[in-house]
Amino acid sequence: MAMSVHIRRLSIADLESCLAVESAAFPPAEAASREKIEYRLVTCPELCYGLFLDSTSIAPSDAADVPQSATASTNASHQNARLIAHVLSTRSLSAVVTDQDMQLPANWRNNRDKPQDSAKVGQQPNGGTVALHSLAVSPSHQKLGLGKYLMSRYIEKMREMQAVERISILTYENLVSYYEELGFQLLGASASNHGGVAWKDMVYTIDTKSD
C-alpha cells in the first residue's frame, strides 16, 4: 500500500522533528543549527512547510500528481504523523541568498518585540525574495520524488502570498538540473562560501501579473 502524506505549515512545536531531519540530511558544516531552525520557525513560520508521513494510508482521487510511492491524504488522521521533509526560509532584500540571510540577529530572542526590519541580518519582512535555506528530506525517504513534490507545493504556497517576487536558493552544482526541472534558473556561482561549498545561485521567478 502506498504511504499517505500531507503538507502543512510548520511551527515551533516542530523544532525537534525539523532538527532531526536537517541533521540527517546535511553534513554538520552545512546543516542549520538548532538556534537557526528555532529562529525561522518563530520568526517566519509562514515560509516554513513540512511533509508528513501519516499513520494511515488512503488513496484520494486528487492524488494524481503525487509520487507513485505516496498518496496525498485529505481526511486521514494526522495525529501520529511523522515529519520526513521540510522547507525552511526567510525573506530577503537581496535577489539571491547571501550569508547575511543565513545569520541570526544579535539577542533575537530578547528583541522579538522590536520591528524585524531593524535587524541587518536574518529575516527581512519587507523583502520580496524568499531565501530558501533548506530543502531537507530524511535519508530513508530520499529518491522517492518527495522532495520535488514538497517543493512544487511550496512554490504554489508562495504564489499565494503577498509581495513575493522570487524564491532563491543556494545549491550544489550536481543539483542544478534537479531545480531546473522545478522551474528555477541558474544565475551562476554564488558569492557565499557557507560550509566551504562552491554554491550555485538559482532563482524561481514568481509571476505577479494578474490573470
Map each language-model feature to its residues.
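Conserved active-site alpha-helix within GNAT-family acetyltransferase domains
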Residues: 160-163, 172-197
